[in-house]
A protein has these predicted regions:
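Conserved beta-strand/loop scaffold segments within soluble protein domains that form the structured core
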Residues: 36-37, 44-252
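Short, Gly/Pro- and small/polar-rich lid/capping loops
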Residues: 1-55
Length: 252
């Protein structure tokens, strides 16, 4: 990956933030690894490999990107996503779309870092997974120790026949701030999903997590679970629900 010269200094700062969130910067720069680096409303760099198409645009302060993965793509190395915001205050909006083909085996590692100030981060994500595919998504966050972070994210995933979707969200290395997460999954026949969230709330953090699994296809199965530590005067509201909409299903 080549970083734009105009963004070289900002990339140095985002490197530090990325490492705070648990990332390895070398993975962002390797040419044989799919990666995307977003800082505020700017795309600092991106890289892709054969079989994966990454389209990115910014418009009116919003970062929009679409990742299309062709049928049969199986990656030995994870796709790395780096999201950060380095200003003392402001808003960050991201719209993400993923289209994953049939017979794929894909792992995503996402690290998000907001080390400064009063930030509103809003993200809408849609993922469509084809048939007979395995998709793992690990999303780790690092926020600052003040109370200025408002994280508002909405995820929708459709899991095709015989496919597996495994999603892990983690925010345990810092305060959470105000957190609102909505995860919705639709499962087709013989598909499986695991949704797991781990969050550590401190002081007056405000946590809202909703994980909804719709078992639409026969013999589909799903797990939605959250691990929350609420210290001090933290408020936490967690909703995990599964709906059986097929004649034959399994809820674990």
């Amino acid at each position: 990956m080549n970083i734009e010269k105009n963004y070289a200094k900002e990339f140095e700062m985002i490197e530090k933030a990325y490492e705070q969130a648990g990332g390895d910067v070398s993975n962002l720069l390797s040419k044989d690894i799919v990666s995307l680096i977003i800082s505020g409303d700017k795309v600092l760099g991106k890289n892709t490999v054969e079989g994966i198409h990454l389209n990115v645009e910014t418009s009116e302060g919003v970062v929009n990107y679409e990742m299309i993965i062709e049928d049969g793509v199986k990656l030995d190395k994870p796709i790395h996503l780096c999201v950060g915001f380095l200003k003392n205050q402001g808003e960050q909006y991201i719209n993400a779309k993923y289209k994953i083909g049939n017979n794929c085996d894909i792992k995503f590692l996402s690290h998000c870092s907001f080390p400064f100030g009063k930030i509103h981060h809003k993200m809408d994500s849609e993922m469509i997974i084809g048939e007979n595919s395995i998709v793992f998504m690990e999303d780790e966050h690092f926020h600052n120790e003040k109370d200025g972070i408002y994280l508002e994210t909405s995820y929708y995933t459709k899991v095709g026949k015989n496919s597996v979707f495994d999603s892990r969200f983690k925010l345990t290395k810092s305060r959470a701030g105000k957190l609102k997460i909505d995860m919705f999954v639709d499962l087709d026949e013989h598909s499986k999903a695991l949704l797991e969230s781990k969050v550590w709330g401190k002081k007056d953090d405000d946590l809202e997590i909703r994980e909804i699994v719709n078992l639409n296809g026969e013999y589909s199965s799903g797990i939605a679970k959250s691990y929350i530590v609420a210290q001090d005067s933290t408020r936490a509201e967690v909703i995990n629900e599964a709906y059986g909409n097929a004649l034959i299903l399994k809820v674990i």
